[in-house]
Amino acid sequence: LAGIAFSNSGLGLNHGMAHALGARFHIPHGRANGILLPYVMSFNAGCAEQLTSTAKRYARISRLLELESSSVRQSALNLIRTARRYIEKLNMPSTLQAAGVNAAEFEEAVHDMAEAALADRCTATNPRSCTAEEIEQIFRKAYSGKLP
C-alpha cells in the first residue's frame, strides 16, 4: 500500500537524487533525502536565477509558518533555511561532506550520480525540469553546503 502511495505522489528530483546518492555512498534513503532537501528546494524555486512558480508555493508555506518577509524570493529562502535548520536540529548532517562522503570519491561519482538521478522515474514528476548538468550542480552544492 505504501508503494502505491509513493508511486502516485510525484516524489520528484529529491528522491531521484537520493536513490543515486544512497546507491553510491550507502547513505540511508531518509538521511539522503534530508541532506538533499534544501538544495533541491533552492533549485526548484529558482533561487539562484529567475524565480519559478514553485517559489510562490514556498512563499505561501513560509507565510503559513509565519516566516514572512518582503518578497517571494526572501520568503522562499526563509522556508529553505528553516528546512535546513530542522535537519540540523535532528542531528542529521546538512552536507554530503558532513555525512562522511570523501571528496575524491565524490568527484569521481558525481557525474554518474547526476545521470542516474536524471534517469530515475521519480525525477520525471519534479515541478521544474532539469538537466544532468543542473543535477550535478545541486550535488556539488549539497557537498559543500552552498545555499543562496
Spans of model-derived segments:
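Glycine-rich phosphate/diphosphate-binding loops and the adjacent beta-loop-alpha structural elements
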Residues: 1-8, 19-22
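Short, amphipathic C-terminal "tail helix"
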Residues: 105-148
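Gly/Pro-rich interdomain helix-loop hinge
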Residues: 24-108, 148
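Generic alpha-helical structural context detector
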Residues: 19, 38-42, 63, 115, ...
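Short acidic alpha-helix initiation/capping motifs at coil-to-helix transition points
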Residues: 12, 84-92, 112-118
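Charged/polar positions within long, soluble alpha-helices
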Residues: 4-7, 42, 88, 122
